Regions:
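Basic, Lys/Arg-enriched alpha-helical interface segments
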Residues: 1-66, 75-79, 86-125
Length: 125
């Protein structure tokens, strides 16, 4: 098929917490169900609902208070989730996602340096 499977993962901060999961856990059952469907669409490569702002994607769910999922695409095969919100807090949610995205990119650089030296050990684990 033309749509490729994309890996969708939550961004984990250095303390291991997931801003996306914290937001998701605050949703009621119906909203959580809508968000779960949206996430599975992303996994199928369906990004037609995503609007982009400076590298941050906003997946809009046309339901209830207008839920949004904030994400970034890292290459073709990976989408990173930074959190979500409603239309009401859109601007602050976008700003927060941008900060997390910068942090993600910075840490990814550091990790790839470490991995270069760590590759031999990893195979034996």
């Amino acid at each position: 098929s033309s749509m490729s499977i994309i890996k969708v993962q939550e961004y984990l901060k250095e303390d291991g917490s997931s801003p996306y999961q914290e937001w998701f856990n605050s949703l009621d059952v119906q909203a959580a169900a809508k968000v779960t469907v949206a996430k599975s669409r992303l996994e199928l490569g369906n990004t037609s609902n995503v609007k982009w702002f400076d590298g941050i994607g906003e997946y809009k769910i046309d339901w209830g208070p207008g839920y949004r999922i904030y994400l970034a695409q890292d290459g073709k095969q990976l989408i990173v989730l930074f959190g979500g919100g409603t239309k009401k807090n859109q601007q602050s949610d976008i700003n927060r996602a941008k900060e997390l995205y910068q942090e993600y990119k910075r840490r990814k650089k550091e990790i790839s340096k470490e991995q270069a030296t760590d590759n031999d050990n990893r195979d034996k684990r």
